[in-house]
Each structure stands twice: as C-alpha cells, then as structure tokens.
Amino acid sequence: MPGHAFNESHAQRSGLTGGVSDRLHWIGGAGDDCVPGHYSIGIRTFTSSIANVAPRLSLRLHELASAGQSTELTKLMDELVIPLYALRSRRKGYEVSAMKAMMDMIGLVGGPVRPPLVDLREDEVEMLSGTIEKWRPWL
C-alpha cells in the first residue's frame, strides 16, 4: 500500500529528526543531476562526480539550490550538467568512464577504467571535449 509506505517512511523520518532538528542532514546519495529535486524536498547535500573535474561548478550548483535561485540553477543544469549525464547514461559504467576521461583531458589523472567497465568510444571522447569547452569558465 503506497500510502502505508509513505506514512511509515514519514513517521520514521519524524522519529529520526526528533530532538536533533538542524543537526541531522539528509544526504542525497545521487549526484549532481538530482540537485534541484533533492533541494526542493529539503536535502541539502549531494555526491558530486563533477567536483572531480570542476569543483567550482559543483559548489555553484549547491549555492544556487540552497538560495532557491531556480532560474540560474536550471540554466546551469540544462547547459552543463544534463548533457554530461546524457552521455554517461549511454552505457553501463559510463558514469565512471566519462569522469575519468574528463580528468585525463584537463590534465588530472583519471586513469584507465577497470573491467568490466569500458572506455568511451572515440566519438564520445569528442563529445566530451565539447563539454569541457563549455565548462572552461568553471575549471
């Protein structure tokens, strides 16, 4: 029963937050692409693969979401985050492959992926180069 699960989950959250209020932080286990949704329901943290390549961009996503500046946040998401996540979703494991490739491309050490993951194809590396060019102000 969906209502039961929600009510139980809500009760559990209420039980967890009782007595700790602002000292308990919900950590969003998903990444940069979930920032708008997570922040809209009170989650104020996220795991960021983007921070490995462009920590300033990751921090800006947090700042905008925290301040409720949805117009600018949506613009950054649409222009810089969603295209990367679209590439990463092309194949299982590309979450890792793409970020390692980006690190290598900007002079950091991403290194090779471990099996069973595979490297990006050449055309996808070219696409990633375009992403990096758009990210230049954040590097």
Predicted regions and their residues:
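Residues on a specific face of well-ordered alpha-helices
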Residues: 56-59, 97, 126
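Flexible C-terminal active-site loop/helix
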Residues: 108-139
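Catalytic alpha/beta core domains of metabolic enzymes, predominantly
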Residues: 1-81, 88-91
